[in-house]
Amino acid sequence: MLSFMLISESMIFTSMDNFVEALFEIDENSKEKKIKSYIESFTKGVNDIINLYYGIKIPEPILDKFFGEKEKGGLVFKFIRDLFMSLNKKGVQPVFILDELQMIKDIVMNGGKPLLKSLFQFLVSLTKERHIAHVFCLSSDSLFIEYVYNAGELEGRAKYLLVDDFDKETSLKFMDFLAVEGNINLTNEDKELIYSYVGGKAKDIKYVIEESKFKDLREVLDFMLKDEVSKLRKLLVKIKTKKIAEVEYENVVKALKLFKDNYEINEYLMDENTKEFLIKRNILFLNPVEEILKPQSYLVWNAIKRVLQNINDF
């Protein structure tokens, strides 16, 4: 298996050129100028061991050729298709992973066609028509996920896979694993305390356990919660004082109160404008398949409940 992973989170995308830059990684070992010759040599050098590339390997002369093309999108897609077909003929299954795909949502190609639409059509041709690759499109933007899920060109051609927080049992096992790795003594009470603050979000669990090696566990957890509470309070103050005017303060408070006793709610219990605002602010997460809204994390949920206790103080 050969995996190509495009990570775009750290880049700013404003044009097709930015997308091409993110797709490819310069192959320093090749100065080949002909696409066909390079694909043949690259395929020949691939072995049966699992390989992971952060970007598709390409010689600089060929990449320069892409940038010189007016309709570079067509040439780029053709190169990827021919490369994957060549690998497939050798018995190697390419896996194409595109992360944070929402970054290219507003880019249009030279002909005025949205890049995202062309990309989806191309990916469908790789998977459902030619069967030469597996493709995973990742995003942390749940509004974008909803948009993609409802996109007509993907209907019946893509599966929605939710990468969710761990359940409690898995969370406790993950804590045990990290504790052993870090030579940290965690009691059952410690693990229950951690879960009560951060739930099953892996990165939060990892951070807490790493910090607890040098600090008091409850101090670490209390600081994390205070930080989330502070950010939420400041946001509400800006809304109430009209420094943020895109939503009504009363509507936001009403929306947050829906989570006072519930971690998950039906998305239609909240008005669309407030829902989109809270999702964009990374306070809420939308599961478009289940039509469920929930806080971005257990920690955020705890912050919401803490803020609601003193909501009249604003």
From Swiss-Prot:
It comes from the Archaea. One of its GO terms (molecular function) is ATP binding. InterPro entries: ATPase_dom (IPR011579), MJ1010-like_2nd (IPR049081), P-loop_NTPase (IPR027417), WH-like_DNA-bd_sf (IPR036388). The keyword Cell membrane does not apply. Keywords: Plasmid. Belongs to the archaeal ATPase family. This is Uncharacterized protein MJECL14. It comes from Methanocaldococcus jannaschii (strain ATCC 43067 / DSM 2661 / JAL-1 / JCM 10045 / NBRC 100440).
